[in-house]
């Protein structure tokens, strides 16, 4: 198969969570799959953290803005490559795509009522873009991947998609994540308890 993967922002220096998921997935595919041919579409950036290999081709697409990159440059590139499918990795995708579409939908926070409006101009535009694009592309997707059974349930309840369209595939974890030795002298300075749960994440 010829498989196209959108990984637009993985070359930017300050990567976000979705960028790392896409990057590590592609790295693992490079190690594991030497039969299918992959075309990775990326926006140019300073951190060239991925190189082409035998069956994995890095294709840089230049475009001034994210929406134009995704809605104009990406579909044109896909049309010229003629892959068997396009996998978009970060919640959004082209509204018009000439090949079957697979989408990774990490969450639907942007479709819910906002608790705060203290966003930068860039974040504000991204929020509106996702609200506009996501509901329109979901019916066109052959398959939608989300990151947990919990998120799958939330998406099904909120958007009433066919159950067979949406699958949960849990993220892997990098080998640099491991259990740290206990350091009670440090933790007791901040948490006066033997057992505790320290959580970092969104508020949804």
Question: What is the meaning of each model-derived region?
Answer:
Residues 1-204:
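Carbohydrate transferase catalytic cores enriched for Leloir-type hexosyltransferases
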């Amino acid at each position: 198969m010829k498989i196209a993967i959108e990984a637009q922002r993985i070359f930017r220096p300050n990567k976000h969570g979705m960028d790392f998921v896409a990057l590590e997935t592609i790295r693992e595919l490079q190690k594991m799959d030497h039969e299918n041919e992959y075309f990775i579409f990326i926006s140019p950036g300073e951190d060239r953290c991925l190189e082409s290999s035998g069956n994995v081709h890095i294709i840089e697409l230049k475009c001034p803005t994210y929406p134009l990159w995704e809605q104009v440059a990406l579909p044109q590139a896909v049309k010229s490559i003629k892959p068997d499918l396009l996998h978009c990795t970060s919640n959004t995708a082209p509204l018009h795509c000439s090949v079957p579409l697979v989408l990774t939908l990490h969450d639907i926070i942007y479709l819910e009522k906002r608790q705060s409006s203290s966003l930068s101009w860039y974040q504000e535009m991204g929020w509106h873009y996702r609200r506009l694009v996501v509901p329109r592309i979901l019916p066109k997707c052959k398959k939608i991947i989300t990151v947990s059974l919990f998120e799958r349930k939330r998406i099904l309840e909120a958007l009433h998609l066919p159950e067979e369209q949406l699958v949960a595939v849990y993220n892997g974890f990098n080998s640099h994540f491991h259990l740290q030795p206990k350091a009670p002298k440090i933790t007791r300075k901040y948490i006066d308890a033997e057992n505790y749960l320290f959580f970092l994440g969104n508020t949804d």
